[in-house]
Structure formats: structure tokens, C-alpha cells
């Protein structure tokens, strides 16, 4: 009998911290390839978030898993401004980010969606 693979069998979630800069890199990988990743850079008054998803690969549940991992970081649990850059047109990803914020404003910039909001904390 063939065993079917689940998300947890096919993909790995990893978080790496650049201690000298206080930046975080969260990724979902399939073997050596990034399926989706997020870079988080906190400052005194805000957090910059940049998310990228490989074309045609990441199901909505994987993107949600990535965003859940990002917002589980301690740095995302204090009320401050979120400045996020997401792939333009990825409404599932935008909705997942917006659930963690208030006063969300979006605008298009090239192939990106820029999101400003206030973290719930």
C-alpha cells in the first residue's frame, strides 16, 4: 500500500533569526526550494514584513501556515505599525495578514501590494 504524504511530510517550516540585526526569516520549503517565505524586520515603532510565494506552488493553507508562524513571533505581539509587502492579487494572503491588524490600508505598487496597519498585539 502506498502512503500518502501530508503537508507536514512534504513541507518544512523554518524560522531563522539574524541576531546581529534582529531580523527574522520564516520559510516553508519543499526540499531545497522555498515555496513561500517572509522576512520580518522590527524597528522601534514599526515592523516591516515582506512575503513572497513561488508561483503556482503554495496552496492557501500553506500561505496561512506561513502567516500564522510570522504572527507567532514575539516581535509581532506588541502594538505597533505593520508595513507589509505582499504579492499583488493574493487576496488569501492579504486576508490572513489583515486578521492580525486594525486600521488596514492597502495600495498597489508595481507587482506588490503595500499594506499598512496596526498590529493587535
Each PLM stretch: what is its role?
Residues 110-121:
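C-terminal "cap" of GNAT-fold acetyltransferases
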Residues 74-86:
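Conserved GNAT acetyl-CoA-binding A-motif
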Residues 1-19:
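Conserved N-terminal entry element of GNAT/NAT acetyltransferase domains
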Residues 58-72, 99:
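Conserved acetyl-CoA-binding loop-helix of GNAT-fold acetyltransferases
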Amino acid at each position: 500500500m502506498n502512503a500518502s504524504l501530508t503537508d507536514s511530510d512534504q513541507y518544512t517550516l523554518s524560522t531563522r533569526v539574524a541576531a546581529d540585526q534582529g531580523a527574522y526569516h520564516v520559510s516553508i520549503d519543499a526540499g531545497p526550494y522555498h515555496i513561500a517565505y517572509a522576512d520580518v524586520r522590527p524597528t522601534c515603532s514599526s515592523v516591516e514584513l515582506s512575503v513572497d510565494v513561488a508561483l503556482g506552488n503554495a496552496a492557501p493553507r500553506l500561505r496561512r501556515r506561513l502567516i500564522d508562524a510570522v504572527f507567532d513571533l514575539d516581535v509581532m505581539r506588541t502594538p505597533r505599525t505593520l508595513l507589509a509587502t505582499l504579492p499583488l492579487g493574493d487576496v488569501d494572503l492579504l486576508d490572513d495578514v489583515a486578521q492580525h491588524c486594525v486600521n488596514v490600508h492597502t495600495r498597489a505598487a508595481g507587482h506588490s501590494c503595500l499594506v499598512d496597519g496596526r498590529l493587535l498585539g
